[in-house]
């Protein structure tokens, strides 16, 4: 087994590989700007014409889910806290099933572009506006951080130019989003998934070779207590246990996969409901693959540095720099491969940022422009959508610049992103699962859930949980020697959810701090969702419930839930009060029923009457 040595630096070939990834991403945008007649309507631009198929959408969902925060953060998480993080494999399964069987059927049969349009259909315009504004604010904030945080971590270890990377990422994303719309975003994501897999593979293969085999890595991990898969402690104050990951993780990530515009917009762009559901289940395989790669990289990190921790030895200044440090350590003799891993990390960033920009443009056009300017033509809306992509791209780059001045507030912003998702998911669940819920209950429930989530989340940042709650594992520096001594790094970044933003020391710990504020961060969304649901139900009941007849399209019906089990020989899409059977529920995307009905070539019913 090789011993750690002085780390290398970026060379010309590394920059060439990284630049190549950006150029190919931009080229895909140019292609889809003109392919098939270009972006003639807002539906073409925002939804890919609603004719996408399962496999590219599945890969896009995977890429959008796995940002650079995952590529850099998950291995360091495993390095510090152990492989219990791999329990998220079960969480992903539950998330995909809930999203595919509860939320997707309702969104798909309505043929909507913005998920927040559902809130007006189900409740009223005020509820829709609240949901839209919350989404826009959290997404701009989070996207700016996704651009800045990995650039900072990579800059500090590799010397990769910080602002060059930030601006290049933002400009390239804005470029191909503006030109090619959702089709460009999805197919660029497909390319970037390949880059992510190649980057992980290069690190894993070389780590296995240098450490003397997979068995050596696993033995080192076992000896260091990193194979801690099964911690069934039910205490909700423990940061990561089987239950916090399964329960809290399911709520947290369902708020993204189930109701977040960035993800929903992709799978409802599929040409049939079957394809939409299939994209989610294929995506599950991708999630498992990326999780396996990132967890194994974390174990390889520990095997490599089990007796000389670079973080404790001040070789790096924060945990999120450990993966770039490992890459320059083990791949320095292979010009271009460090650049491939940086391209891997930035592929995660590009996919997340492009998804966010496209989603922001969609909700702005659908929720804030179309309802008030109904005379605009589809061509005009397409141009406006492209213009909004440019505006939001610039805002996200500006947010990245602001993030550089925020210092430790980066973690607070990431936490707020999670805290907003829970109440929003509770709001959608209230509408889809509770037929008697009314608009008053929805508004009051959303405000209550949001307030409670902010309370516990901000409190946890000001008064962080004690180490016995987070359970960090032992790190050793006894094996460090004088030949393994690089210049200390001075600038710091912080690992999400592991340290305090405000660093309040020497305060008298109160029961509120040791209990409520010490709640596992994975339960923030859980609390927000459940409070929103409970308050929404109680307020709806106390105000007389919903007084108007409820269109069955707005809730999950028995036919929706059981449609995949062939219980009904004739499936129905209830798109009006006069429902009638069709050959295959979901064969035609309902957003294009007017096209089907006006076509003399279509001989079958489309499941709707206009």
UniProtKB/Swiss-Prot annotation:
Residues 1-9, 73-83, 154-161, 211-239, 301-336, 411-415, 461-518 are extracellular. One of its GO terms (biological process) is iodide transport. PROSITE patterns: NA_SOLUT_SYMP_3. Residues 596-610 have a biased composition (Polar residues). InterPro entries: Na/Glc_symporter_sf, Na/solute_symporter, SLC5sbd_SMCT1, Sodium:Solute_Symporter_SSF. Induction: Down-regulated in some primary cancers; due to aberrant methylation in primary colon cancers, astrocytomas and oligodendrogliomas as well as in cancers of the colon, prostate and gastric regions, and glial cell lines. Expression reactivated on treatment with a demethylating drug, 5-azacytidine. It is a multi-pass membrane protein. GO terms for molecular function: iodide channel activity; lactate transmembrane transporter activity; monocarboxylate:sodium symporter activity; monocarboxylic acid transmembrane transporter activity; organic acid:sodium symporter activity; propionate transmembrane transporter activity. Glycans are attached at residue 485. The chain crosses the membrane at residues 10-30, 52-72, 84-104, 133-153, 162-182, 190-210, 240-260, 280-300, 337-359, 390-410, 416-436, 440-460, 519-539. CDD domains: SLC5sbd_SMCT1. A motif (PDZ-binding) lies at residues 608-610. Belongs to the sodium:solute symporter (SSF) (TC 2.A.21) family. Interacts (via PDZ-binding motif) with PDZK1 (via PDZ domains 1 and 3); interaction increases nicotinate transport activity of SLC5A8. Acts as an electrogenic sodium (Na(+)) and chloride (Cl-)-dependent sodium-coupled solute transporter, including transport of monocarboxylates (short-chain fatty acids including L-lactate, D-lactate, pyruvate, acetate, propionate, valerate and butyrate), mocarboxylate drugs (nicotinate, benzoate, salicylate and 5-aminosalicylate) and ketone bodies (beta-D-hydroxybutyrate, acetoacetate and alpha-ketoisocaproate), with a Na(+):substrate stoichiometry of between 4:1 and 2:1. Catalyzes passive carrier mediated diffusion of iodide. This is Sodium-coupled monocarboxylate transporter 1. It comes from Homo sapiens (Human). The lineage of its organism: Eukaryota, Metazoa, Chordata, Craniata, Vertebrata.
């Amino acid at each position: 087994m090789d011993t750690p040595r002085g780390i290398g630096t970026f060379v010309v070939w590394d920059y060439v590989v990284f630049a190549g990834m950006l150029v190919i991403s931009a080229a895909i945008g140019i292609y889809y700007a003109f392919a098939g007649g270009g972006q003639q309507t807002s539906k073409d631009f925002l939804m890919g014409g609603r004719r996408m198929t399962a496999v590219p959408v599945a890969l896009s969902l995977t890429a959008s889910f796995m940002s650079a925060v995952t590529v850099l953060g998950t291995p360091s998480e495993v390095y510090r806290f152990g492989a219990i993080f791999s329990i998220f494999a079960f969480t992903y399964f539950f998330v995909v099933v809930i999203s595919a069987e509860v939320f997707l059927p309702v969104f798909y049969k309505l043929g909507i572009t913005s998920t927040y349009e559902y809130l007006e259909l189900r409740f009223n315009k005020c509820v829709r506006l609240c949901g839209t504004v919350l989404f826009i604010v959290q997404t701009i904030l989070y996207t700016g951080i996704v651009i800045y945080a990995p650039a900072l971590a990579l800059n500090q270890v590799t010397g990769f130019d910080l602002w060059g990377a930030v601006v290049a990422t933002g400009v390239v994303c804005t470029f191909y989003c503006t030109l090619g719309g959702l089709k460009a975003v999805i197919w660029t994501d497909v390319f970037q998934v390949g880059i992510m897999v190649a980057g992980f593979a290069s690190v894993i293969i070389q780590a296995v070779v240098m450490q003397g085999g997979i068995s050596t890595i696993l033995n080192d991990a076992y000896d260091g207590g990193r194979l801690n898969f099964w911690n069934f402690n039910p205490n909700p104050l423990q940061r990561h246990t089987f239950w916090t990951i399964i329960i809290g993780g399911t709520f947290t990530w369902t708020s993204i996969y189930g109701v977040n515009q960035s993800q929903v917009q992709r799978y409802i762009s599929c040409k049939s409901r079957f394809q939409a559901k299939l994209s989610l289940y294929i995506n599950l395989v991708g999630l498992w693959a990326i999780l396996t790669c990132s967890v194994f990289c974390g174990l390889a990190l520990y095997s490599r540095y089990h007796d000389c921790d670079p973080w404790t030895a001040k070789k790096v200044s924060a945990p999120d720099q450990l993966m770039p440090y490992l890459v320059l350590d083990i791949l320095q003799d292979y010009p271009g491969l460090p650049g491939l891993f940086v391209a891997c990390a930035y592929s995660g960033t590009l996919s997340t940022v492009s998804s966010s920009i496209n989603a922001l443009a969609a909700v702005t056009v659908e929720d804030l422009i179309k309802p008030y300017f109904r005379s605009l033509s589809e061509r005009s809306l397409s141009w406006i959508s492209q213009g909004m992509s440019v505006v939001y791209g610039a805002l996200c780059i500006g947010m990245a610049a602001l993030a550089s001045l925020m210092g430790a507030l980066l973690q607070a912003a990431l936490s707020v992103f999670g805290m907003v998702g829970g109440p929003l998911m509770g709001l959608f669940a209230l509408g889809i699962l509770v037929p008697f819920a009314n608009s008053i209950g929805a508004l009051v429930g959303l405000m209550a859930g949001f307030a409670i989530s902010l309370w516990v989340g901000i409190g946890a940042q000001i008064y962080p949980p004690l180490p016995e709650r987070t359970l960090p594992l032992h790190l050793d520096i006894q094996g460090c020697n004088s030949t393994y001594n690089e210049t200390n790094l001075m600038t710091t970044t912080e690992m999400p959810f592991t340290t305090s933003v405000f660093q309040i020391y020497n305060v008298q710990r109160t029961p509120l701090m040791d209990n409520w504020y010490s709640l596992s961060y994975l339960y923030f969304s859980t609390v927000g969702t459940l409070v929103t649901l409970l308050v929404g139900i109680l307020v709806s009941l106390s105000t007389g419930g919903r007084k108007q007849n409820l269109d069955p399209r707005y809730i999950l019906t028995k036919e929706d839930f059981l449609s995949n089990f062939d219980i009904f020989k004739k499936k129905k899409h209830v798109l009006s009060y006069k429902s009638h059977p069709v050959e295959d529920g979901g064969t035609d995307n309902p957003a294009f029923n007017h096209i089907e009905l006006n076509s003399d070539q279509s001989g079958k019913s489309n499941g709707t009457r206009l």
